[in-house]
Amino acid sequence: MNEGEHQIKLDELFEKLLRARKIFKNKDVLRHSYTPKDLPHRHEQIETLAQILVPVLRGETPSNIFVYGKTGTGKTVTVKFVTEELKRISEKYNIPVDVIYINCEIVDTHYRVLANIVNYFKDETGIEVPMVGWPTDEVYAKLKQVIDMKERFVIIVLDEIDKLVKKSGDEVLYSLTRINTELKRAKVSVIGISNDLKFKEYLDPRVLSSLSEEEVVFPPYDANQLRDILTQRAEEAFYPGVLDEGVIPLCAALAAREHGDARKALDLLRVAGEIAEREGASKVTEKHVWKAQEKIEQDMMEEVIKTLPLQSKVLLYAIVLLDENGDLPANTGDVYAVYRELCEYIDLEPLTQRRISDLINELDMLGIINAKVVSKGRYGRTKEIRLNVTSYKIRNVLRYDYSIQPLLTISLKSEQRRLI
């Protein structure tokens, strides 16, 4: 095909895509970052948060709040909704309120949390702290200085606070929950949000009592509640008549199976719409929802593999090689033998077989492999290890990992299972 024919084909493709019926009116409405004007089935939590924060409008310091519930139960969106409303109403009463939102999955050290708070005020103060390099005490001193420049209320929202505490300890929480004793003008309140209630076990009792002055629990949504949420968002997200009748109930039912996760429900609806749009379909159907479910699961599995520790990646690659050699199901001993050779090849200290057995269990729990214990009669019990993800997909993810790349050209000799 010459260049002119390529151009004609591409022209035709663009024309066809332009003529296709538009599916989305505003796709952003289905994203996690969107804060809607109303939050169905969270009015009780909204009211509780408002009651705790209303002292701000009277010029009094509100309590610190600990918010918890599973993923996708509306914690973050509800806290953002209430604090944004508080900020808006405070302007009417001429009360300065600053709300600083920090995602602790990204900002996960004591230093960086403090630096982010200081830098929030940089346009006002002209003071900016680099993300590394200063003594932490100096950053904390700057934080007190910038916050206390005038009378104001500062609400610090620490989302995924458990990630911060598990990685860096609770020192930053100790500082922030006691900062009011060191301020003359400003008043600070902390809202901690967590998916993991057990993380409180990691906290010093003094920090826990300060942070948990008030607690707000978010229970999972049921399928009917998820349906209401999706119906509300769909009205803004899609053009009229593009959703088949069964699409929203199916998205709600699939997400309800996973502890009532509204994020999962919104992702399913958005991805189903994207697939329908790419196919040039005039409607989003249940078939598109099932395709969306498959795509989301694949994407999640890729992310899980990508974030595995190096030893687990080498172990997984040993299982891939056995699979490509036709040697699955394999037992732990077979896998360990290949794993040891791979470690030798990249000069990595191998773990013990007992530890590798633990890592096999972890890969099994993550759903990447299946490690079923089977009885061999008088020979005892053994694990039969199989892949749940294709070798091709695993290779595709691992090829971007520089520490694993030297192994990707290796294969096994059929009989001896030796590396070649």
Swiss-Prot record:
One MF annotation (Gene Ontology) recorded for this entry: ATP hydrolysis activity
SUPFAM superfamilies tied to this protein: P-loop containing nucleoside triphosphate hydrolases, Winged helix' DNA-binding domain
Family: Belongs to the CDC6/cdc18 family.
InterPro entries per UniProt: AAA+_ATPase, ATPase_AAA_core, Cdc6_C, Cdc6_lid, ORC1/CDC6, Orc1/Cdc6_arc, P-loop_NTPase, WH-like_DNA-bd_sf
Function field: Involved in regulation of DNA replication. May play essential roles in origin recognition and cell cycle control of replication. Binds specifically to the oriC region, which alters the topological structure of the DNA and introduces localized melting of the DNA duplex. May recruit the MCM helicase onto the oriC region. Shows weak ATPase activity in the absence of DNA.
Record keywords, A-Z: ATP-binding, DNA replication, DNA-binding, Nucleotide-binding
Subunit text: Homodimer. Interacts with MCM.
Record Gene3D superfamilies: 1.10.8.60, P-loop containing nucleotide triphosphate hydrolases, Winged helix-like DNA-binding domain superfamily/Winged helix DNA-binding domain
Entry annotated with the keyword DNA damage: no
Residues that hold ATP according to the record: 73-77, 221, 233
Record-given protein name: ORC1-type DNA replication protein
